Design a protein with these regions (language model features):
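A domain-level signal for the structural core that forms small-molecule/cofactor-binding pockets
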Residues: 58, 118, 161
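Generic structural motif
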Residues: 18-20, 68-73
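Short secondary-structure junctions
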Residues: 62-65
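Histidine-acidic residue clusters that define the catalytic metal-binding segment
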Residues: 140-164
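Active/ligand-binding-proximal structured segments within catalytic/core domains
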Residues: 27-60, 70-71
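Non-catalytic terminal extensions that flank enzyme cores
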Residues: 1-38, 153, 160-164
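Active-site-adjacent, His/Asp/Glu-enriched structural segments that form or flank metal-binding
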Residues: 73-145
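Short coil/turn segments at secondary-structure boundaries
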Residues: 42-50, 68, 81-88, 92
């Protein structure tokens, strides 16, 4: 089996920011990296779940709503994936994400936290979601990263493999 693209990123040098994870068939997958993998704690599951509800709500009501395909958390809980159609850049996503995070900080409740609307409606933490949002907002505004450090593998025979 081939190694999937996201596993070729050197997570030991990955900083919080926004990255293009992949582009294919007219879709762009953006990696919204909230925490520094393996250096900082992952986002707590309840806070991440709230962040997912809030970000999905905002993006699906934003100027980009017709281009939003998917908004959801990474399994490692260090960030979110947003899949878009159209010609969005990391700078476009930076602007949109900053607007989204600013909106999240004004919210007093998490949307769709009822048993009929959410499969785990009790797993939410708005205060911690806002804490993570504030920290990520600061990083996007003052310490923006958008280029992956690729993992390179060199075999014993000298052959080098790296994600391009």
């Amino acid at each position: 089996m081939e190694v999937i693209q996201s596993f070729t990123i050197d997570h030991t040098h990955l900083k919080p920011g926004i990255y293009v994870s992949r582009e294919d068939k007219g879709f762009t997958t953006f990696d919204l990296r909230i925490t520094e993998p393996n250096q900082e704690p992952a986002v707590a599951p309840a806070a991440m779940h709230s962040l997912e509800h809030l970000m999905a709500t905002w993006f699906r009501n934003s100027e980009a709503k017709d281009d939003v395909v998917y908004v959801g958390p990474m399994g490692c809980l260090t960030g979110m994936y947003i899949i878009m159609t159209g010609a969005y850049t990391v700078e476009d996503m930076q602007r949109l994400t900053i607007e989204c995070l600013q909106w999240i900080l004004t919210q007093t409740e998490v949307p769709a936290t009822r048993p009929e609307a959410c499969g785990n409606y009790l797993l939410h933490d708005l205060p911690m979601c806002k804490w993570e949002s504030r920290r990520y907002l600061n990083r996007l505004q003052h310490d923006f990263h958008c280029e992956y450090t690729q993992l390179q593998v060199t075999l014993e025979d000298g052959m080098v493999f790296a994600d391009a």
